[in-house]
């Protein structure tokens, strides 16, 4: 994938998203925008995440310092194409409202939509676990105690025709580990 001269959109505000921002800049992207569905975290200490919880604070990496537009509270709704080429992504502003039962805040779409021009998009989201609705549920895949897809050493799922790898199996980790997992499963598929 070559980012030279492209309008790059990175969907996801974590470490993997930061890696995508840096790589796009080093490839010579025309512009790089990074969006995150969550609110912008505070700088410094966050009273909402005291020790020993994972600290939710604003992180500005060396990749961000190389240059990008960073935006928060945006959900991606759809990709927009023209003549088989991506030209943008429709995004919508979201709000986070307290849960009636006191649990995690709930996302509410505001109806405020816009198009972010992009001809290359990197998907770098999903820190907690794979989405259970959709493929996992429809294919009746078994999951482990952390809701990751359960596999054997070769990457087979409970459905013997399907393999899984990367963060969907291990949980959030480094990109290089996901790549290694993908290569190992590819070898299993090739056998």
Question: What is the predicted function of each stretch?
Answer:
Residues 73-85, 93-97:
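A conserved short coil-to-beta-strand element within the FAD-binding core of flavoproteins
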Residues 3-14:
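Beta1/beta-strand and adjacent pyrophosphate-binding region of the FAD-binding site
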Residues 1-5, 98-172:
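FAD-site-proximal beta/loop scaffold in flavoenzymes
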Residues 17-22, 27, 159, 165-190:
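A conserved FAD-binding loop/helix module that cradles the flavin
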Residues 56-58, 64, 89-110:
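Active-site rim loops that border cofactor/substrate pockets in soluble metabolic enzymes
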Residues 13, 36-40, 167:
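Cofactor-binding loop segments of dinucleotide-utilizing enzymes, especially the Rossmann-like FAD-
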Residues 21-78:
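Rossmann-like dinucleotide-binding cores of NAD(P)H-dependent redox enzymes
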